[in-house]
From Swiss-Prot:
GO terms for cellular component: extracellular region. Residues 1-8 form the signal peptide. The keyword Disulfide bond applies. SMART domains: Knot1 (SM00505). Residues 10-72 form the LCN-type CS-alpha/beta domain. The keyword Secreted applies. It comes from Olivierus martensii (Manchurian scorpion). This is Toxin BmKaTx17. Keywords: Disulfide bond, Ion channel impairing toxin, Neurotoxin, Secreted, Signal, Toxin, Voltage-gated sodium channel impairing toxin.
Length: 74
């Protein structure tokens, strides 16, 4: 079955370059960041696996997410 024009999304930590999360303290910051990148919404996940970081709901597949491994800062 081939479906065209259908976009899928995932719930995940949105990532910067080098596999790093966006740290946060406020939900409105993350909601803005996530929706600007095509997600339905977002919030600041407090004390999560990567500390306080932005979590997006239904983030498009073409946007980077945090994957296992280190954050490689420049």
């Amino acid at each position: 079955l081939l479906m065209t024009g259908v976009e899928s999304g995932r719930d995940a930590y949105i990532a910067k370059n080098y596999n790093c999360v966006y740290h946060c303290f406020r939900d409105d910051y993350c909601n803005g960041l996530c929706t600007e990148n095509g997600a339905d919404s977002g919030y600041c996940y407090l004390a999560g696996k990567y500390g306080n970081a932005c979590w997006c709901i239904n983030l498009p597949d073409d946007k980077p997410i945090r994957i296992p491994g280190k954050c490689h800062r420049r």
